[in-house]
Regions:
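Juxtamembrane intracellular "pre-TM" segments in multi-pass secondary transporters
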Residues: 193-223
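C-terminal ends and interior cores of transmembrane alpha-helices
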Residues: 33-48, 292-306
């Protein structure tokens, strides 16, 4: 998780400077290039079975993702009338969860069911019926210890298991690298609308002036703070769905992933619903209402037990659907090239 989000942390500001100096198209091309390279690095990483190689590949991949997000979101805002910019970004962002859903479906139906380590854990459960009377978190500890003992006592068999699982995991990254490479050439030879007003490379002085204006813009600063809290909450909610299902209810990894897919489907459908509602509500009003709903559901996830708590946790996704693009749109309203 740290390596994944490190790419966003180290690339976001350089990406913004890059597209400010050059163009949105240049940002898209560089982002797709890094995305393809990062995904391709998973091939040698799986061959050499080096953990830090995987972390490096993941960081490069997310640097590409950061460039794509930093480029695409303000580009969408700039492509039309300012009054409908936030609604336009919500519509564009509604297609984002489709990729997440596809990835979750592949992980649940193709990857998890083929992983030998998951088969090992299931065999351990069957061999120890007493686990049925234990807390899921305790069972998970026993299964992790059993896997560690297996690695110690039968290192060759454990290494073969790892190698087989890495081949299974590698496939989707190869597909990502191919798709990103194809898109790179599609955008390379496409003519995109120009929305920036400057027609020359920006100087260091002009960039300093831009940062100065941003720091003095109260709405922008508050938007950055709000977005930081939102993204932190989103990561925690979506990461915790699987852990909650496995540790608090006792679901298998594949079953818990199924509930994660449900959360993403709710998130996806709510994005389209909220895009429609923005035709009748001001962005700030709708954002406030859904924030209140998210608070109520968060309290439910904290204090309710079993499936009621899980359903509350999943329901938060409906409220989160509006937040990222709407906070983004409100914070960047009337910003111009900045």
């Amino acid at each position: 998780q740290f390596a994944f989000y490190l790419g966003y942390g180290i690339m976001a500001i350089p990406a913004a400077i890059f597209i400010r100096i050059y163009s949105y198209k240049a940002g898209i091309l560089l982002g797709l290039g890094l995305y393809a390279v990062g995904a391709s690095l998973f091939i040698p990483a799986s061959i050499y079975q080096e953990f830090y190689f995987f972390l490096g590949a993941l960081c490069v991949l997310t640097c590409g993702l950061a460039l794509l997000e930093v480029t695409a979101n303000p580009y969408v805002l700039s492509m039309g009338h300012p009054d409908t910019a936030t609604r336009r970004l919500n519509l564009a962002q509604a297609f984002n969860p489709m990729g997440s859903l596809t990835g979750m479906f592949i992980a649940s139906s193709v990857i998890l069911n083929k992983l030998q380590v998951e088969a090992f854990r299931n065999e351990e459960r069957l061999a120890h019926p007493e686990y049925n009377d234990m807390l899921p978190s305790v069972v998970d500890g026993h299964l992790t210890q059993a896997l560690s003992d297996f690695a110690t006592n039968e290192p060759i068999a454990h290494q073969a298991m790892q190698a087989a699982d890495l081949v299974t995991v590698r496939g989707p990254y190869v597909a990502i690298a191919i798709i990103a490479s194809v898109l790179f050439f599609v955008y390379l030879f496409s003519k995109l609308p120009k929305t920036m007003s400057h027609d020359h490379p920006l100087t260091i002085g002009e960039l300093k002036d831009t940062f100065g204006r941003l720091i003095r813009n109260q709405r922008y600063v508050e938007g950055v703070i709000a977005q930081a809290f939102y993204v932190g909450a989103q990561i925690m909610v979506w990461t915790f769905v699987i852990h909650y299902g496995m540790m608090a209810i006792g679901l298998t990894a594949a079953e818990a992933q199924g509930y994660n897919i449900i959360a993403m489907m709710i998130f996806l459908s709510s994005r389209f619903i909220c895009t429609f509602l923005l035709g009748f509500f001001r962005p700030g009003q709708l954002l406030m209402l859904l924030a209140i709903g998210a608070i109520v559901l968060t309290l439910g996830a904290i204090f309710l037990q079993g499936f009621a708590g899980l359903y509350s946790l999943i329901g938060i996704s409906a409220c989160m659907s509006l937040m990222y693009p709407t906070i983004y749109g409100i914070a960047l309203k009337d910003m111009g090239d900045d």
